[in-house]
Amino acid sequence: MNVLVIGAGGREHALAYKLNQSNLVKQEFVIPGNEAMTPIAEVHTEISESNHQGILDFAKQQNVDWVVIGPEQPLIDGLADILRANGFKVFGPNKQAAQIEGSKLFAKKIMKKYNIPTADYKEVERKKDALTYIENCELPVVVKKDGLAAGKGVIIADTIEAARSAIEIMYGDEEEGTVVFETFLEGEEFSLMTFVNGDLAVPFDCIAQDHKRAFDHDEGPNTGGMGAYCPVPHISDDVLKLTNETIAQPIAKAMLNEGYQFFGVLYIGAILTKDGPKVIEFNARFGDPEAQVLLSRMESDLMQHIIDLDEGKRTEFKWKNESIVGVMLASKGYPDAYEKGHKVSGFDLNENYFVSGLKKQGDTFVTSGGRVILAIGKGDNVQDAQRDAYEKVSQIQSDHLFYRHDIANKALQLK
C-alpha cells in the first residue's frame, strides 16, 4: 500500500523509518518532511503541512491508501476531516476530537465531568482576574495558556512574583484570553501512548519518560522535550495497569460519550503521585521525542497495528529486549530566540539519528529550527543505552548546539 506521512520533525522521521520497515508498505511519501528522510521515503518539501488542498491533490495523484498525521497543528486545523471526506484512511483524530490537545480547558472539563484523576484547576478569561487569583492561591502553581504552544505554554511558578511574570508572558499586551491555573502535583512523570478507536483503547505496554526542561537537573524553561528513554524501570507494571484502568479506558469512553470519535494515538502525559497516577496533559498525537525512542524499541509492525485498530482489533505490541535513550541537540538560545543556518555534520542518515531542524544547503546540513537532531542509544539496560547515546552525540560536529548531559539519569538513580 501507499502511505503518506504528514510532518517535518524528528517524530515524523521516526514514523517514516518505522513504517518503511513494514512489508505492508510499498511506497512511502512524506509532506513536507526534511532532506534527512530521503533514504527511507519520497520527500516533498515543496508542499507545506498547512496546504490542505495541496496534500489532498497529492494523495489523489499518488493513490495513497493511508495518511499518518504526525504534528498537532494539522489535526487541530482539520486536515484529517478533509482527507476522510475524500475517502482516505487517516491515522489521526478529526478536528473535534483533537480539541483534547488544542484546548487545555476542554481537557480539564471532560476529566472533571468523568472523574478522571487530574490536578484541581481554576480557569480565568481576563488578565485582571488572573492577577487577582494568584494573590491567594497555593504555591507553587502551574500556569497554562489555553491552546497550542509547542510544549512551551506551561510555567510552574514558585512565588507570587513568578506567577505575575507568568501571567505577563501568557497575556502579553492582551487583556483577555483563557488561562488555566492548576494545583502543582509532585511525583514521577511518564508518557503513555494509547491507540484509540472510539471506546477501544489499547495502551502501549512500554512507557517513556520525557525531559521537558532545557537544562541539566531539570532547570531552565520548558521545551518541546530535550530527550527521552524507554522503558522506565521505576514505573511498575501495576502503575501502568492502573493508568490504563483509571485514565486510558475512561477517557476513550468519555470522548465517545460526548460525541467525539477519536481515531489515532492519544498521548497521556501522567504523573505518579502518592494518590496514584494523574493526568498532566493529553496530546492527540505521538510525543516528540517519545515517539523516536518508543518506535526504535518497537519490534512489531506499526502499519499492522494501525490496520488492526481501524478494524477494531485489540492489537498486541511487541518490543525488543533492550533499552533506548534519545538525547536532543538544540540550537543555542532555544526555547527562546536562536540563530539558524549553522552547519552540522558528523552524523549518518540512519536509525541512530532522527532529524527535527536541519535543511540541506548545497552538500551540507544547516540548522533550521530550535530542536535540531536526536541521537539514539541502544543497550541491554538504561546505563548501556545512555552511554551509547552520548557516544552518538559526541560524533556530531557543530559549535551552535547544546544538549542535556543527564538524560535517563533518573532511571539509574532510582533503579
From Swiss-Prot:
Cofactors, names only: Mg(2+); Mn(2+)
Enzyme class per UniProt: ligase
Catalytic activity: 5-phospho-beta-D-ribosylamine + glycine + ATP = N(1)-(5-phospho-beta-D-ribosyl)glycinamide + ADP + phosphate + H(+)
GO BP terms in the entry: 'de novo' IMP biosynthetic process; purine nucleobase biosynthetic process
Keywords: ATP-binding, Ligase, Magnesium, Manganese, Metal-binding, Nucleotide-binding, Purine biosynthesis
HAMAP family the record matches: GARS
PANTHER family named in the record: PHOSPHORIBOSYLAMINE--GLYCINE LIGASE, PHOSPHORIBOSYLAMINE--GLYCINE LIGASE, CHLOROPLASTIC
Entry protein name: Phosphoribosylamine--glycine ligase
Name of the gene this protein is made from: purD
